[in-house]
Amino acid sequence: MDRAILLLSVLSVGVSSQPITEGQRLFSIAVERVHNLHLLAQRLFSEFESSLQTEEQRQLNKIFLQDFCNSDYIISPIDKHETQRSSVLKLLSISYRLIESWEFPSRSLSVGPAARNQISPKLSELKTGILVLIGANQDGAEMFPDSSTLQLAPYGNYYQSLGADESLRRTYELLACFKKDMHKVETYLTVAKCRLSPEANCTL
């Protein structure tokens, strides 16, 4: 009986200590990076929201729910079921587009210089990492098969000189959209990473 238990223990250790592939390692780095960006986006949005009056919060949230983020023009899964059905390459390509769409707008986020100086290099590092993952998963497929000619206007009117109320709305929308998009990318990369483990349950 003791020998059987010992044998099961050895087998268990053998199974759980399978070497991590290079692809899994790169995915883990990418997921960790976007997770940190998502946490930063959540913190910045919460700090800004807490600086508002209750009525200002209510009005801005109401406006935001009726508006669109710039990145909404990027074709992406509409729900968790479509996300789970999407290929790894598609999830990576959408993630790349989303990160790329924030490289310029992130410089205009109304946050402290310390936080703003963190965001740009983090986005750049993540974009580079996703590009490496796309190359590793491409197998001759087109990098951006859907809407490859799509060009996004970089939040055009957000850089104009605005009144106090419009400036408040601009800041709210930028921070809310940044948080929303980092959540999307974290979800897509997490699902894509999970696909590398056939025995894993990748449900959202």
Curated annotation (Swiss-Prot):
Keyword Transcription regulation among UniProt keywords: no
Positions contributing to Zn(2+) binding: 35, 186
Disulfide bonds listed in the record: 69-177, 194-202
Alphabetical keyword list: Disulfide bond, Hormone, Metal-binding, Pyrrolidone carboxylic acid, Secreted, Signal, Zinc
General function of this protein: Growth hormone plays an important role in growth control and is involved in the regulation of several anabolic processes. Implicated as an osmoregulatory substance important for seawater adaptation.
Family stated for the protein in its record: Belongs to the somatotropin/prolactin family.
Protein name per its UniProtKB record: Somatotropin
Originating species: Dicentrarchus labrax (European seabass)
